[in-house]
Amino acid sequence: MLYRFWKTGLAIFMPGCILLSSCSFRSYIPTPSLRNTVGNHNSYVNNTVPKNNFYEKFYDLTFALNFTNQKTQEFGTGWLIDWKGDETKDLNTLTIASSSIISSVSNHSLKEKQDDKLFIAYIATNLHLIDGLKNDHDYQPYNKDGNGLSFPFDQKTQSFLLGRFANPKINSKPEEMNYQVQTRLKQDAMVFIQTSTLPKTAYAGIDPINFDYHETSDESGFWTKKQSTANFPRTRTLKSYADFAVLEVPLFLDNANDAKIYQEWIRPAVQAYKELGDVENIFAKTPYAEYINNTYYLLGYPVTNNNKYQFILGQDEKWKFSQQTSVLKHYQKQPLQQRTVYVERDDGLPTLTFNEDKLTHVQGTDLINVDQITDTNLGNGLINYAGLSRFTLSYHNVEYKLFGYGTILNNTNFPGGSSGSAVFNKEKQLTSIYFGSLINVTTGNNRNVNLGLGQILRTYNTNNSKHSAPSSYDLIFGDKNTIKFYAQFAKEKQTHLWNKIQTSVNSSISFYKDKK
């Protein structure tokens, strides 16, 4: 039996004082919110596919994520950040070669045909969420824990599914899939599809900047550049992290499930990505002052009590996973093949939710006014994580210190499962990635105080940091302070994002195009 837990990202606890009183923000303690309870429906619109409104493209871009091992399963949210392959290929107009045709060609031609059927989607999410991905076939160093040790068997990922609230679009007979009511095939449901193979880690936001954090006994702490030769006795040195990561999800188009994901979900996501500005314009790089008066839009899949159904499309055991081509041998077939089933759950379900008020239909939210919080790390709804000593995270059994700037979203209490949701501004640009909410534990029942946290992905230079931490960083394209960023992987794999960097005249995305 699997014990089910859901992550909101980080639940931020503050013992001993009440939020928005005149107490220091240093009192907040981040804790991964692995909870065996689920959230209740909030005031936002849910279980409705957005059409012809501000959220429509965000929906197309966004997916629910599900990792399962021997003991637990975890839910989160992710969004398409990049891809590799021919996104114009319409499987509805193509016929993939039959096995009889394939068997008649040479081994070399067979390899080319099979490799041509691979499309790779890159899905952005939170670092703390992909801590649940433990895959022996992952890229180094992610195929082992942070100490170079193999993962215990009961922690290894057994299955991975992508999800979306949508129509199942299944033509099989109901009795073949254990359906109770045939009409459910025509209804929107929370659809999860198991991919043919386990994903890999394309990028993990660990140690991305040229700075380290030195933890002191009085919790003040300080940052230094890595090149510093100074000795700091009675301190513990932690590398930095940003709560941002990218999954590599291979889709083999001769596999029915992978082909369905590509055709029905990824192709619309690619179209939305391009309509939102493609690589040149989708990633905001906004001066801090412009954050204050903006509006923020959030769409994700928090786990809540839900009266909808869940449809799980498991892997077909008949699919032959060939180990004989250079591409296929680098991926691991899913160890646990899920059953195909239509179920009604009473223990919570990922729920499509976006921050449009159900009653007033007001869309989006503002940053919180934090004038009442007396801490120099905060100002006008922005937060400097570098100066908050307790914001740490264990990824693959190694502890890291959070750095960077973030947004504090007012009236945003998306519960577990919303980790990794993209936060857009009113210009429909991606500004940050949602990773958790603030919790007040002084009441004894861990009351959510309706404030959500995002990690800004790209920043301008600023001189307002009081902690000797980097004043700018860019987790997508890199800058003078960022030594590990996603575009490095994109260059290595020659993805869509890298091709755009190569041809773009937009200097803000080409800073590192000629660098390793």
Swiss-Prot record:
Domain of life according to the entry: Bacteria
InterPro entries xrefs: Mycoplasma_peptidase_DUF31, Uncharacterised_MG067
Keyword Glycoprotein appears in the UniProt entry: no
GO cellular component: plasma membrane
Residues lipid-modified (N-palmitoyl cysteine): C23
Listed transmembrane segments: none
Membrane-topology descriptor: Lipid-anchor
Subcellular location(s) of the protein: Cell membrane
Lipidation (S-diacylglycerol cysteine): C23
Keywords associated with the record: Cell membrane, Lipoprotein, Membrane, Palmitate, Signal
Similarity field: Belongs to the MG067/MG068/MG395 family.
Protein name as it appears in the record: Uncharacterized lipoprotein MG067
Top-level taxonomy: Bacteria, Bacillati, Mycoplasmatota, Mycoplasmoidales, Mycoplasmoidaceae
